[in-house]
Amino acid sequence: MAKIRETVADIDNCVFDFGGFSAHGVLNIIKESNWVIIPCLPDFNSLLRTAETIKEIKEINKNIIILATDYKDQNELEFLITNLTENFKEFKVIYFRNSKIFKNAINFGKSFDELINENAISQNGYKNFAKEYHRLLEILKTTQGE
């Protein structure tokens, strides 16, 4: 069973989610990580927070992936593409459309792949999400960063 500790341990093949908050040891974890994934929602405030976070950590670890997430329509996607491409050319960007897969993963205790592969309907319904999700996994698996 996992335990909450005062400091964060360095664990291989692990994803840390700090929920937007700094915890003791975060910078050490970032320094030792192959990749740092920074989420960005389709609004100006989130874009500013993303910029602040990148500014704070890019000298510690430049292997940053921006996860542009929760966009609901073409206008929000275009907002993300325009602003992220214009301001963060040197980083990889993955786009996750707003999807029920997040809620379903939590509610049913299943992984994204388990939900995607449940049946033909879910494969079709999650098709676009699956494409970007697997693209993210390939980046994480096939490259160790720079």
Walk through the language-model features, giving the residues of each.
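Switch II (G3) loop of P-loop NTPases
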Residues: 7-26
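Short, well-ordered alpha-helix to beta-strand connector turns
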Residues: 11, 33-34, 61
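Structural beta-sheet core signal
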Residues: 16, 38, 65-68
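Inter-motif core of Ras-like GTPase G domains
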Residues: 21-44
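Conserved C-terminal guanine-recognition region of P-loop GTPase G domains, centered on the G4
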Residues: 47-69
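Conserved nucleotide-binding/hydrolysis micro-motifs of P-loop NTPases
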Residues: 71-74, 101-102
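Beta-strand-loop-alpha "switch" segments that mediate conformational coupling across diverse proteins
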Residues: 81-116
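Inter-lobe coupling/hinge region of RecA-like P-loop helicase motors
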Residues: 104-134
